C-alpha cells in the first residue's frame, strides 16, 4: 500500500499545507495522516473508489 502527494502548497488563508494525494487504497488514509489544512483531497486510484476531503475537525470524509 502506498500514496503519492501530487500537490503540496501553503494555504493562503490558513496556517499550514494543503495537499492533493493519490492512494492505492482507503487504508492508506491512516498512513497519510491529518496534519494538513481542511480542504485537502485524497483520491483512491481504483475504478468506482471514493475520494476524500479533510474537514475542519481533521477527519477524512468521503466526497
Predicted feature descriptions by range:
Residues 3, 57-63:
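Tryptophan-centered short beta-strand motifs
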